[in-house]
């Protein structure tokens, strides 16, 4: 669509409705978290109050804000208790680590020297001091709005395993985009739809069912088993 309607969230009656509506859906569905799309697009104070009210009602609930900035300063500004602006508080527990995501593919696919490769990751993590809570930052290799981590089907899983191991053992809250476990690949060059294809299997007309090992290729099973092993290890450790 060319445009979307705006709601005046400075209207207290509207904000009360939006907050009550959110609480109703959380209670009804039993979810434990919300990803708030384009979080910074709305009035800062309105979103801060919404986050605060939700957290007061559900202290263990998490809200992930899509704050798409290519710098740590841009992302960290929106996290609760930000050191970058102590005059106000967003009450947003988790922001997305787009600065790290933006360089992670190049970091693992290029040779490491003084400026490239894994040094790019070091440079990003060295700026963690900007976040009020780096452990609450959402880390990811890709999602529905970016190119997939794999632009094409790999011949081997060397750099892929390194990237997965890093994602699941570094600081923060890891997010794995569906299909990563079976090496789904593609980019947005022609269409966003190319990175949002259906997961093969379980749908009418699908020729393969990648939900089961028998239908996956040996390389897909290797990737699937590797991710599963690290996730089991992660789940069993603090």
Task: Give the location of each predicted region.
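Short, solvent-exposed helix-loop connector elements
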Residues: 150-154
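Conserved interdomain hinge at the start of the Helicase C-terminal
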Residues: 160
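Conserved active-site segments centered on acidic
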Residues: 169
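Active-site-proximal helices and loops of the catalytic beta/alpha 8
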Residues: 21-23, 27, 32-132, 137, ...
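Acidic/polar loop patches that form or flank catalytic/metal-binding clefts of enzymes
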Residues: 65, 172-180, 238
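Chitinase-like catalytic core of GlcNAc-active glycosidases
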Residues: 1-19
